[in-house]
């Protein structure tokens, strides 16, 4: 997305993501080796916490406009990958690139500029408790500037409509269900006009019906607005609906990187063992 102010008229309301015309699962798209313009690149990234290696020599890339789902058991570094991409953690070795810029050596002010293009939807939503839902979604718009207040109101209303939360605009986050808070957090993330959206376990602690609806929201928004997505999840049904490509982490390493269909059909014993686990019983990472 460019740096112009968000045009309220360009945000179209979707159909019900749970309805019969909900978007189909993403088509299989093989990663393109040497893609000249990947949005995100990890090159030989390693990180340890104390004496415990978390990620070792992990490499992958995400093409512009595609969705990568990061899968793996508890404690393999899925969420750590997102935090490094946001600049909250620095790798011990290797490099991370966003739109061709290496971010691993950036100062905090430089990282703040990157975070205007890359935003993260946290597990807990990270909403401001003292602000209403509308005020939370409006916050990045007001920080960014460039819109009249009437335009801010219009954009907020349309974003809340996009995620099905238009009826809770005046509520405080604490009064909302987990699923509603996640939906509002997605709306707030989008108000920052990101090029890349990171989702950290969006279906944790929600029932399958809400998980399906969140998946429909995420997929439809990506389709309409064209941003790149990275989704950390333990929910295979959720991943099947969203993923263009899959990164499977095992024992701190990139055990598989490729199209979802290839992952699901793999006869690799480690992948089969993961697929045969009850995904809804996996602990949070």
Predicted segments, located by residue:
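Conserved ABC ATPase "signature" region
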Residues: 101-102, 149-167
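Short coil-to-helix segment of the ABC ATPase nucleotide-binding domain corresponding to the Q-loop/switch region
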Residues: 131-139
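Helix-to-loop junction immediately C-terminal to a conserved catalytic motif
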Residues: 86
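ABC ATPase NBD coupling module
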Residues: 103-119, 143, 149, 263-267
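Catalytic Walker B motif of ABC-type/P-loop ATPase nucleotide-binding domains
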Residues: 197-200
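Conserved ABC ATPase signature
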Residues: 172-176, 180
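Conserved catalytic motifs of ABC-family nucleotide-binding domains
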Residues: 193
């Amino acid at each position: 997305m460019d740096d112009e102010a968000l045009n309220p008229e360009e945000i179209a309301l979707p159909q019900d993501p749970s309805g019969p015309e909900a978007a189909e699962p993403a088509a299989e798209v093989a990663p393109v080796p040497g893609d000249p313009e990947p949005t995100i690149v990890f090159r030989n990234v390693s990180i340890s916490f104390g004496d415990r290696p978390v990620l070792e020599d992990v490499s992958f890339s995400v093409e512009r406009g595609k969705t990568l789902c990061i899968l793996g058991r508890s404690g393999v570094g899925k969420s750590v990958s997102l935090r490094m991409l946001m600049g909250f953690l620095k790798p011990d070795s290797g490099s991370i690139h966003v739109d061709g810029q290496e971010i691993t050596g950036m100062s905090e002010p430089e990282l703040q500029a990157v975070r205007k293009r890359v935003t993260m939807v946290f597990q807990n939503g990270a909403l401001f408790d003292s602000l209403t839902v509308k005020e939370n979604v409006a916050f990045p718009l007001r920080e960014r500037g460039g819109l009249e207040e009437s335009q801010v109101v219009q954009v907020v209303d349309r974003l809340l409509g996009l995620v099905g939360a238009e009826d809770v605009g005046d509520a405080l986050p604490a009064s909302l269900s987990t699923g509603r808070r996640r939906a509002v957090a997605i709306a707030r993330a989008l108000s920052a006009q990101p090029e890349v959206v990171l989702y950290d376990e969006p279906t944790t602690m929600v029932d399958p019906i809400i998980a399906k609806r969140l998946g429909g929201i995420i997929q439809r928004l990506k389709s309409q607005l064209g941003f790149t997505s990275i989704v950390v999840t333990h929910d295979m049904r959720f991943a099947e609906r969203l993923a263009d490509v899959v990164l499977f982490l095992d024992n701190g390493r990139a055990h598989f990187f490729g199209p979802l269909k290839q992952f699901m059909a793999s006869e690799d014993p480690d992948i089969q063992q993961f697929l045969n686990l009850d995904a809804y019983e996996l602990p949070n990472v």
